[in-house]
Amino acid sequence: MAAAGGGGPGGPGTGGKIRSRRYHLSSGRTPYSKSRQQQQGIISRVTDTVKSIVPGWLQKYFNKQEEEHDRVHSASEVIVNDTEARENNAEHHIYVVDDDDDEEGNSPTDGRVTPEPIINVDEEVPSTSQSAINNTDALTRPSLHRASLNFNIFDSPALNCQPSTSSAFPIGTSGFSLIKEIKDSTSQHDDDNISTTSGFSSRASDKDLAVSKNVSVPPLWSPEVDRSQSLSHNSSMTSKKPTFNLSAFGSLSPSLGNASILNRQLGDSPFYPGKTTYQGAAAVRSSRVRATPYQAPLRRQVKAKPAAHSQQCGVTSSAARRILQSLEKMSSPLADAKRIPSNSSLSHTPEKNVMDIPENPSKRKKVESPFPPVQRLVTPKSISVSANRSLYIKPSLTPSAVSNTNSRRIQPDKHNESRKNNLQTTSQSHSFSYPKFSTPASNGLSSGTGGGKMMREKGSHYSTKPANEELDGPVLPEIPLPLSTAALPSFQFSTLSGSATSPISVTKPANSTTCRLTSSSPSFTFSSPIVKSTESNAQSPGSSVDFTFSVPAAKASSATSDESKVSAVSRAAKTHAAVSSAKNTDDEQLGFCKPAKTLKEGSVLDMLRSPGFSSSPSLLTSASSLNRSTPTLSKTVGNTFSPANVSLGVGSKQAFGLWQCSACFHENMSSDSNCISCSALKPRPTETSKKLPASPPSSNTKSTVPLSSTPGLGDIFKKPAGMWDCDTCLVQNKAEVTKCVACETPKPGTGMKATLLIPSTTKSTNPATNTLAFASCSASIPNEEMFKKPMGSWECTVCHMQNKTEDNTCVGCKAEKPGTVKSVPTAAPSGLLGLLDQFKKPTGSWDCDVCLIQNKPEANKCIACESAKPGTKAELKGTFDTVKNSVSVAPLSSGQLGLLDQFKKSAGSWDCDVCLVENKPEATKCVACETSKPGTKAELKGFGTSTFSSGTAAPTFKFGVQSSDSTAELKSGASTSGFAKSIGNFKFGLASASTTTEETGKKSFTFGSSTTNEVSAGFKFGIAGSAQTKPDTLSQSTTSGFTFGSVSNTVSLAPTATSSGSTGLQVAAVIADSNLATTATLKSAEEKKAEAPTITPFSFGKTDQNKETASTSFVFGKKDEKTDSAPTGSSFAFGLKKDGEESKQFLFGKPEPTKVDGSAASAGFAFGVTNPTEKKDIEQPGKSVFAFGAQTSITDAGASKQPFSFLTNVSSTAASSSTCGVSSSVFGSVTQSSTPATPSNVFGSAISANAPAPSSGVFGNLTPSNAPAASSTLFGNVAPSSTPSGSSGLFGTAAASSTPATSTSLFGSAAKLSAPASSGGVFNSAAPAAPASTASSVFGSVASSTNTSANSANIFGSSGGAATAPGAFVFGQPASTASTVFGNSSESKSTFVFSGQENKPVTSASTSVTPFLFGAVSASTTPAAPGFNFGRTITSNTTGTSSSPFIFGAGASGSASSSITAQANPVPAFGQSSNPSTAPAFGSSTSVPVFPAGNSQQVPAFGSSSAQPPVFGQQATQPSFGSPAAPSAGSGFPFGNNANFNFNSTNSSGGVFTFNANSGSTTQPPPPGYMFNAAAPGFNMGTNGRTTPASTISTRKIKTARRRK
């Protein structure tokens, strides 16, 4: 760390201990003295190590060194006036530092490796800063004094904020730490009030934390600028946010620290200091705005203070100072405002080292203020800005930030003088005072900018250009257009250069240039280009002249001549104007294009309509003799205007050969004989019009029209004689037309009609009717004649429209002609006769007063609203009383009968008064709202309500309406459910609660509604329905339809309660009228009110509680339980055992409790749901909803029903034996009930019941029952039962029963029965049967029977445990039993066993085959061949047959040594430890583990404390997850199991692979079969895999990381 820097508290490691102030005048050290790194003690090293962990923005308070060895204190340099400084704390006195005394003035730079030479202005002698050698982090401590704000911030980088006690003016790049401010008593008092948060009132400012001078380990956190490579002043502009210092993990030399040359952090830019940022060096090179407007050179008075103490902050603790320092670094409005540049003299833009260009301050890194935000305000002081203030540039190779500081400490006159000299050399050729960048430093970086980004040598943008620099226009070659006018129209925008029209000549027929086919350009030009023909124009006849817009200073082509030019001006005209062609040549010497000197007049259309755009040679020829009608600028020497007295465009049209159609006034080419628009004939030319030459004229002749006859500019817009304006549409018409060409309005003034009537298709013989006649002023009509009324016309007094003489009525408003009898007009004046005739109302038609529809005269009623015709009797209609006007409304004249005929109402149709819907004549009610037809008896009803006239009324479609009816009579807005024979309505989001007792309605498709009446609801989605039915209707048996995932509870008030909770997706509904069995259809079903058994349809997750015997439909993995009544027909049951039991509906994940007393209720499809039946004489059990990870404890007399309890421990301690609770433990919950309860175990929960209760284990539950109960285990549950019960194990469950019961093992469940029972093992379930039992093992299940006379049907790889029963197929298991089924092993014949080992039975009369246990290890005293056990160990101590089905990662342990009748070998559920006594839930604290528990009697669950060995994370007696397994039988390949292969552990028994586990079992297992990842024990997290006996595994030793020196 820093070897020098301020005098810190002495004694390394002493912290903020108060010590006396000492003066350390460390002038004895040489500038190049080595750092004292080797002299550190142990305490200082510890302190340095602690400091290296602290980030750099906190280290600035650690890095105060004990003494300031790098500063030379001289009494002559310091004006010690402590009293004056304390009195005038706010005023900072300026003192002069002599440069002679400053030769060895040292200041901490910014932690660079090599000392930078400090160039003084007057001496240019490099003085070395010895603090720059090892001062790595002393620069990161800004002072907390606001007095340092009055520095030039340019000279005070944000990095170098350490207050210095040196009297010499520092030279380094530090500005905030140039002079150590001595705080007066006021500031100390302020600091005392700032924070006294430290526990001890230490003068933390006086006693900072002690640090050693040289720290061997660099700080872990350091500011960004500490790592910057450049020594330019811009390093101070980079942010001081803490960045990770890579040098803490090793650098070139420990003494270098983060000042190592190789210490370039990730992301540092090689071209400018700091990280690579957006915009690169441009972002770094930004102007800094000082906190105060003082400029360099700045002279400040140093207050005397003890040099030993680096900082005075009163009693502010170091932690408080760090907090305040962090606050200073944060962005604040005040800090942001300080960055805003100001143009006032108070805040003059400070000089930069290189250039004074103010840049965007938002790009600039934040210059931190080293003062806490709580001290006194620093007010800017006005300074006088010198006029000759310019930039001082030091032409040295040293970094400019170093050389800048010394140079600014000279006197102002010296400084200004030197800056003037430098300015003359650097920026003498520029008009602004911003010089170029200085010479790049020797390190490759630009010494002025801090960036070395690849930039131009000129680093600045010049705001002005020299006046003499003007861009010359490019000399463009004359490139002819390689296309001819035969393919393209010739664009000719030029008047020919050199043409000068005579002031007296009007038309000039061309002589010389018109004989050329190339001279095809019209004389009209835009004002900009002067087009000259090139050589290729004469070479290719018919080619258009090139035209180019003018470019300045272009040279003329030497090959141009008068003959090669396209000229519309004759040579005679040139001669008459006395224009020399030499002058034209001189004017055109500038280029082939020249700006026009006059603005040509005329229309663009005149040029575009010229024959030059036509490919006809005659037109091209004739176009060359143009009559220029524009006043052209004669190209004389004087450039005077000679306007030609030619009208605009008339002569040019004639010269172009255009003629105007007399019919449509379209201008046509001269070659067109007919108008191209209306096909009218071309009019014959008259003597007043110009003759267009059909061939090139051969002589220069003037036009025959005298100048006096040339029309003026106003004559152009005069109307030709005889033309008239339409009074209707104001379109100008020709004189010969009698109707307007636009609206066909007759010509006004019928008195002139006979004389002016000329067919529009004939050409005019009258000179006044010529289209070009408006060009001559002799045929012009005066303005008063133009607007004169036609003779005989009359003006309407109503609409002021001019009418013809023969019209007796106004053509616009139909008003009569004056002089006749007037009629009051009833229609609004429109004025368009021809247009209104099309919309004229037929005679006799009338408008409806109600809907304003026009009707035919013969119609007596309105065709739209059927209102009576005015004058007839009005008919009252419904709620709409038609308002009849006493005065008949005048018919409107704006109707169109033809269009309305399409929408005409059919005869006899009538509109509903309520909904305004049109109905057919034969309809007596509205088809929409069923309102009676007007005239019939109206019924009182609400708006839009349905009318049920019969029992079979159509259903209504209702959205979101909640209907509730409690009576059987029809109510307004009531739903149709509950009414006799009413077809179910489609209801969306509707909740209908109907408690009618007589009739039950059919309910159809319902979305999300809850129907709680006694009738079964139809298709319902996701709603819970709860209904209370009356005692008289409780005998009805209802069947719920397809319900999806809901629980329907029915609280019966009588033992005969019947509830139909349809809360899920009910597809079918059952009505209580018939015993119609409905399957999963959308049809409604009926069921009788009688107690006849009904079949419930497909239901998803729904529970129906019925007291009656009902056959349920498809049940997926659900156990059906019936108690007393005879079973009825059941539908498809997936994985369901129906043996004397009723079928339940398919319930998906929901418990379904049903009454048990009279008959078994039918439940729908139940996935993992138990349907326990209830006794009819017991109270209704309460239901607990889904409890995730909660522990439910029911102590009331009524047994509770816990549907889905994940990680919950459901314990029912009710002592009342009269209540039969229906508990449903779902997914790993343990339900312990000491009272007769019906546990429903779902997915890995263990249920222990000591009372007669139907238990239903679903998906990996263990349901041991010692009382008569119907246990139903689903999917990997173990249902051992010692009492007569119907157990059905589904999908990997083991159902063990010692009494005659029907057990169904489904999919890997083991069903063990010691009594005559029929066990059906399905899919890798082991069903050991009693001697008189028939075991049906399906797909890898083991049917073990203590009696050899058991009839076992092993299906697909299941092993029969009897001596005569074939063994089940165990994937990777030794084949030890005889098998006759595919994949089973037989004693006489061993079949193929995948990776299994054939094993013969040893000591047992009946060999049991462990089925396919995926990853489980089966350990029993009898050598049982373990099946495919996935991560699971099955241990059995029974001498009888032990069979475990497919258990996925679960451990099963039977600790009872008695026969199977007492305790069956349980088949654990998914990851569950099956203990016949108790099995805890996942996360519940019980005596038996659930999830991946070890095989012990009472192994606690995950995270629970128990006296038994823990399950998850501890070593149980049986190995848990990650603990060694001790299989006593042939074990399969335990993939990742704690088997015999001990990774890093000892194994006492040769076994299989065990990863980091210790197998403490002493039994020698047979050669292991394939056990895929079979680890029966639970996951022992952090138990080192040790069993109860101490293992030889040494515990891991975790070492803390230490950083090497």
Curated annotation (Swiss-Prot):
Biased composition (Gly residues): 1-16
Any GO CC annotation of this UniProt entry: nuclear pore
Location of region: Disordered: 1-44, 185-208, 332-373, 397-476, 497-522, 686-711, 1499-1529, 1556-1605
Residues where Zn(2+) 4 binds: 848, 851, 862, 865
Biased composition (Basic residues): 1596-1605
Ranges of Low complexity composition bias in the record: 1519-1529
Cofactors that this protein relies on: Zn(2+)
Keywords attached to this entry: DNA-binding, Membrane, Metal-binding, mRNA transport, Nuclear pore complex, Nucleus, Phosphoprotein, Protein transport, Repeat, Translocation, Transport, Zinc, Zinc-finger
Annotated Basic and acidic residues bias: 410-420
Annotated zinc fingers (RanBP2-type), start-end: 655-684, 720-749, 790-819, 842-871, 906-935
Binding of Zn(2+) 2, residues: 726, 729, 740, 743
Residues annotated to bind Zn(2+) 1: 661, 664, 675, 678
Keyword Nucleus tagged: yes
Sequence repeat intervals: 249-250, 656-657, 943-944, 959-960, 988-989, 1007-1008, 1021-1022, 1044-1045, 1100-1101, 1116-1117, 1134-1135, 1148-1149, 1167-1168, 1188-1189, 1227-1228, 1243-1244, 1259-1260, 1275-1276, 1291-1292, 1307-1308, 1339-1340, 1356-1357, 1371-1372, 1382-1383, 1414-1415, 1430-1431, 1448-1449, 1470-1471, 1482-1483, 1502-1503, 1512-1513, 1521-1522, 1535-1536
Tissue expression summary: Egg (at protein level).
Domain of life: Eukaryota
Annotated compartments: Nucleus membrane; Nucleus, Nuclear pore complex
GO BP term (any one): mRNA transport
InterPro entries: Nucleoporin, Nup153_N, Znf_RanBP2, Znf_RanBP2_sf
Coiled coil ranges: none
Domain comment as written in the entry: Contains FG repeats. FG repeats are interaction sites for karyopherins (importins, exportins) and form probably an affinity gradient, guiding the transport proteins unidirectionally with their cargo through the NPC. FG repeat regions are highly flexible and lack ordered secondary structure. The overall conservation of FG repeats regarding exact sequence, spacing, and repeat unit length is limited.
Subunit structure, as described in the record: Interacts (via C-terminal domain) with the nuclear receptor kpnb1; the interaction occurs in a RanGTP-dependent manner. Associates with the Importin alpha/Importin beta receptor.
Protein family according to the UniProt entry: Belongs to the NUP153 family.
Physiological role: Component of the nuclear pore complex (NPC), a complex required for the trafficking across the nuclear envelope. Functions as a scaffolding element in the nuclear phase of the NPC essential for normal nucleocytoplasmic transport of proteins and mRNAs. May be involved in the retention of unspliced mRNAs in the nucleus. Probably mediates tpr anchoring to the nuclear membrane at NPC. Possible DNA-binding subunit of the nuclear pore complex (NPC).
PANTHER family: NUCLEAR PORE COMPLEX PROTEIN NUP, NUCLEAR PORE COMPLEX PROTEIN NUP153
Protein name per Swiss-Prot or TrEMBL: Nuclear pore complex protein Nup153
Organism the protein comes from: Xenopus laevis
